[in-house]
């Protein structure tokens, strides 16, 4: 492309300080260096993780910063050494990567790349420790290696999934984070058998994606657990057959679920990050074969406490990161699940706004009114 090797000026939504409205600015985006790719973003979605780091209540604030990590785009140019993608390819940026060289990448069991796994504090490129974004010479920091709230962004090639160019980017862009995390937690880690009983704790976007996984696996009973009763109606679209609100009972919810299911559920997936919900999700699975999978991120001081007999009675507890998907290897196959009409993505997309109205997307999520809001880069 004519822009290859040159600085590109474009619009980006910049977070200058915690909790303040994002500002649409003209930024300069430098060309990609070795093993980097410059992407033209066409659609980006808002994930709760973006809101969390925008609020910056519990972590080191890194500002000014360009947030955003769920997106779909087209390769504009590539840096030295990049052979996996070429200009014109359709890609999904991912907040974690796959170098294909480390022990994790070579293991069939892991997706936690030594080189490129998520780093929320790093605001620069891994190659030279510098930002590719500037405004009037001032560096603007990156976010989890993606920074998709910009018309152009620079990403390490290991954090890009090359996908079917026929796939609609305004739909499959949501597979770059939360939806794949929940879906994979069920399909790749919990692995419920057809006809089994599955409990999903927390019915936000990730929990509903885990529920979608249970539906695809053929579970016969899918029990949604949430303290907001309004979530049940929406959850039915994702296969939810029953709903339990812990607040409606005067005993621990794990006891309620054990009674409901004649001894416990076959599989549970916990998507809240609340440590008590994690304990409940583990203790509610059936002895002998039950498996609980933890997805939600806990507070740093949380302690998981349960009696060791729960393990000796052959209940299994697992954790997962990004649904155990390797970004480059596996995400293209998840896109194909959508293309084959197995995986339904439209029901996750509740809102769509032009990029210039990005603060509206934040407002919708803060009010709990949206699952996924898609932002169109071209107003």
Swiss-Prot record:
Compartment annotation: Cytoplasm
Assigned protein family: Belongs to the zinc-containing alcohol dehydrogenase family.
Cofactor: Zn(2+)
EC nos: 1.1.1.1
Domain of life the protein comes from: Eukaryota
SUBUNIT field: Homodimer.
Positions that bind NAD(+): 49, 202-207, 226, 231, 272, 295-297, 322, 372
Source organism per UniProt: Zea mays (Maize)
GO cellular component: cytosol
Encoding gene, per UniProt annotation: ADH2
Pfam families: ADH_N, ADH_zinc_N
Alphabetical list of SUPFAM superfamilies matching this protein: GroES-like, NAD(P)-binding Rossmann-fold domains
Entry's cofactor comment: Binds 2 Zn(2+) ions per subunit.
Example GO molecular function: alcohol dehydrogenase (NAD+) activity
The name this protein goes by in its record: Alcohol dehydrogenase 2
Major place of residence: cytoplasm
Residue numbers binding an alcohol: 49, 69
Keyword RNA-binding: no
Extra facts: In maize there are two isozymes.
Record: residues binding Zn(2+) 1: 47, 49, 69, 177
């Amino acid at each position: 492309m004519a822009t290859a090797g040159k600085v590109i000026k474009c619009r980006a939504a910049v977070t200058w300080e915690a909790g303040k409205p994002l500002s649409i600015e003209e930024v300069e985006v430098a060309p990609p260096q070795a093993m980097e790719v410059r992407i033209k973003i066409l659609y980006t979605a808002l994930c709760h993780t973006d809101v969390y780091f925008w609020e910056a209540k519990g972590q080191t604030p890194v500002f000014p910063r360009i947030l955003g990590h769920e997106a779909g785009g087209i390769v504009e140019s590539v840096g030295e050494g990049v052979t996996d993608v070429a200009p014109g390819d359709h890609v999904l940026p991912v907040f974690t990567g796959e170098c294909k060289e480390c022990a994790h990448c070579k293991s069939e069991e892991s997706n936690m790349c030594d080189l490129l796994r998520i780093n929320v504090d790093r605001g620069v490129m891994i190659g030279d420790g510098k930002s590719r974004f500037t405004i009037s010479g001032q560096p603007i920091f990156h976010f989890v290696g993606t920074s998709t709230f910009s018309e152009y962004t620079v990403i390490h090639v290991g954090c890009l999934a090359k996908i079917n160019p026929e796939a609609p980017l305004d739909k499959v862009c949501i597979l770059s984070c939360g939806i794949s995390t929940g879906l994979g937690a069920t399909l790749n880690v919990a692995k419920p058998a057809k006809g089994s009983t599955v409990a999903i704790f927390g019915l936000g976007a990730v929990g509903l994606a885990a529920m979608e996984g249970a539906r695809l696996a053929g579970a016969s009973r899918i029990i949604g657990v949430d303290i907001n009763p309004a979530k049940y109606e929406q959850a039915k679209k994702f296969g939810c057959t029953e709903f339990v609100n812990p607040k409606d009972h005067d005993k621990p919810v794990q006891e309620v679920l054990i009674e409901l299911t004649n001894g416990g559920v076959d599989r549970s997936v916990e998507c809240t990050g609340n440590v008590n919900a994690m304990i409940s999700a583990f203790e509610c699975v059936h002895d002998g074969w039950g498996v609980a999978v933890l997805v939600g991120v806990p507070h740093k001081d949380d302690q998981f406490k349960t009696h060791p007999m729960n393990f000796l009675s052959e209940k299994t507890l697992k954790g997962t990161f990004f649904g155990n998907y390797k970004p480059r290897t596996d995400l293209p196959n998840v896109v194909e699940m959508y293309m084959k009409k197995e995986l339904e993505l439209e029901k996750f997309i509740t809102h769509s706004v032009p990029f210039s109205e990005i603060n509206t997307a934040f407002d919708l999520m803060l009010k709990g009114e949206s699952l996924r809001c898609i932002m169109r880069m071209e107003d």
